[in-house]
Structure formats: structure tokens, C-alpha cells
A protein has these predicted regions:
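Enzymes that bind and transform nitrogen-containing heteroaromatic metabolites
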Residues: 1-184
Length: 184
């Protein structure tokens, strides 16, 4: 499972820099992003969360099944209405609600919303609703997907980090400091 987020870093220019307790982890201010998202940010996010290399899929699938202690790797289902391999994006309810309607669900990705209050009946969109992190593990065991990305918000990041389920973090450096009231 990977995570996508933005952070400010003093190590500008370093590749593969360490993401640690000293990394600024501001995510929001008064219910919105504290910085203006530009088209490059959105293109990068889309590129990362939609990229699929089908030639590496079998190896990834094998590693996942081994990690999840599954006996068989053949007992997976395709997502309805999806003919091609896609990534999974997992977000909290607030994050889902912040996405403009014209972009819902995020295209070319399997959208999963983590919420204790929402129900599948509340949605016209083709999305999965889960109530807890453990439900995602069960769902992922049934889906045919390439990678899984956690895309926020702060509570969702915290839950996955605390359970040590995030293997890799993709983050964008910000060259300024912003006032934030939501962190992870």
C-alpha cells in the first residue's frame, strides 16, 4: 500500500529523502488545501495513481498473496464494469466530498471510500464503501488490481501508518510554509 501526500521539506533537491517525524505534515486549513493545486500537481497525482505496468502484475500479485498469507493467487475477481487492470485509491469521506463532482469517481482507478457513516446506497457512482481498515484488506483480496494508494485525509493516513500498512510514500515537496490545522 502506498500513500500520496504533499509535504514541505528543508532537503530541497535530494532524491529519496527520508520521510520521518521531522517532516512537515500539514494537510489542510479550515477544510481546504492550504496551497493552490496547479495543473502540474494534478497531472503528477493522476500519473502516479493511474500508472499500471501489466508486465509486472503477476510478480506483484504473488508478493501480495504471500504477504496476506493467501493459499491461492487465482481466487480474485475483476471489479464490475472494468476490463483493464487499474490501481485502487482509498480516501476518507471528507476527502471524497472535497473532489469536484465532475471528477467523481476518479477515472481509471478503483475508488474506495473509508467511512463509518456512509453506505453504498448513498452513491450513484461506482465506488466501494468500507467501514474500517480491515475491510480494505478483505476487499483487496477479492479485487484484481495493480497497486493501492491511500490518498487522504489525515485520519485515513494515521490509521494506515499506525497499522504499519504503508510500504511507500509518494510526496511532493512544497517550497513554502503554509498555516495548517490538519496534520498526519
Amino acid at each position: 500500500i502506498c500513500a500520496c501526500c504533499k509535504v514541505e521539506s528543508k532537503n530541497e533537491g535530494k532524491k529519496n529523502e527520508v520521510f520521518n517525524n521531522y517532516t512537515f505534515r500539514g494537510l489542510g486549513n479550515k477544510g481546504v488545501l492550504p496551497w493552490k493545486c496547479n495543473s502540474l500537481d494534478m497531472k503528477y497525482f493522476r500519473a502516479v495513481t493511474t500508472y499500471v505496468n501489466e508486465s509486472k502484475y503477476e510478480k506483484l500479485k504473488y508478493k501480495r498473496c504471500k504477504y496476506l498469507n493467501k493459499e491461492t493467487v487465482d481466487n480474485v475477481n475483476d471489479m464490475p464494469n472494468s476490463k483493464k487492470l487499474q490501481n485502487v485509491v482509498v480516501m476518507g469521506r471528507t476527502n471524497w466530498e472535497s473532489i469536484p463532482k465532475k471528477f467523481k469517481p476518479l477515472s481509471n482507478r478503483i475508488n474506495v471510500i473509508l467511512s463509518r457513516t456512509l453506505k453504498k446506497e448513498d452513491f450513484d457512482e461506482d465506488v466501494y464503501i468500507i467501514n474500517k481498515v480491515e475491510d480494505l484488506i478483505v476487499l483487496l483480496g477479492k479485487l484484481n488490481y495493480y497497486k493501492c494508494f491511500i490518498i487522504g485525509g489525515s485520519v485515513v493516513y494515521q490509521e494506515f501508518l499506525e497499522k504499519k500498512l504503508i510500504k511507500k510514500i509518494y510526496f511532493t515537496r512544497i517550497n513554502s510554509t503554509y498555516e495548517c490545522d490538519v496534520f498526519f
